[in-house]
């Protein structure tokens, strides 16, 4: 079972296909922006907007703060209330809508940004009413409304993870609390002992979700001297 299959097994919602999701998003975009954009003109940007909504939900961001009335990246100087992850999401969203090529969407970016919170909220409500979702929405719903009675296995084994999204970390916490999860982490002590950014996250995960495998030798491959033999052609 993949992590995606696990989430889907714990939710009554179904992940809809991309075309359905973008077409539904277009309705809410048109309603709140009063734009005369056609679906053809919107579709590419709709996929981008959907991708950003997906990232926001998988990182469990506060959409009202992230989609506040912010018209310029320089306003970051005064948004100390945002977490680093939220600032990163916001920065990426601005960059995605930046560029040399002009389009009605880009020219009206400021007005679009100021209604994104309404689009996001209304869109998700409409999807939920149809019993469907995009992947990040479903993941977030499972993480925020975890119900252990929906678990179908006695134990879940998570192997090979090294960087978690917020929704994954929340699910791991819930399963660990129910004593229904064991973990096999993918890491090397080289990253742990050299102030590497990857090591920082793994250290936190190992503390929260102890590794099932003991022993240090299997986690020190990058610190050993390699013996490489070159074969001639």
Each predicted region: which residue ranges?
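Nucleic acid-machinery interaction/catalytic patches
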Residues: 1-233
């Amino acid at each position: 079972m993949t992590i995606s299959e696990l989430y889907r097994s714990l939710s009554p919602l179904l992940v809809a296909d991309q075309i359905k999701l973008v077409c539904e998003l277009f309705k809410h975009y048109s309603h709140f922006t009063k734009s005369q954009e056609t679906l053809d003109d919107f579709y590419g940007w709709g996929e981008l907007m959907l991708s950003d909504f997906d990232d926001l939900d998988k990182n469990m961001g506060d959409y009202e703060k992230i989609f506040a009335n912010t018209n310029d990246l320089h306003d970051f100087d005064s948004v100390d209330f945002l977490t680093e992850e939220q600032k990163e999401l916001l920065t990426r969203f601005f960059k995605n809508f930046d560029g040399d090529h002009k389009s009605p969407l880009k020219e009206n970016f400021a007005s679009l940004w100021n209604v994104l919170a309404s689009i996001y909220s209304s869109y998700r409500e409409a999807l939920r009413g149809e019993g469907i979702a995009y992947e990040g929405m479903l993941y977030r719903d499972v993480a925020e409304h975890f119900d252990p009675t929906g678990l179908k296995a006695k134990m879940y084994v998570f192997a090979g993870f090294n960087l978690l999204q917020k929704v994954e970390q929340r699910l791991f916490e819930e399963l660990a609390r129910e004593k229904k999860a064991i973990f096999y982490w993918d890491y090397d002590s080289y990253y742990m002992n050299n102030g590497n950014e990857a090591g920082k996250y793994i250290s936190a995960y190992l503390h929260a979700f102890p590794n099932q495998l003991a022993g240090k030798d299997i986690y020190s491959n990058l610190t050993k001297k390699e013996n490489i033999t070159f074969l001639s052609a």
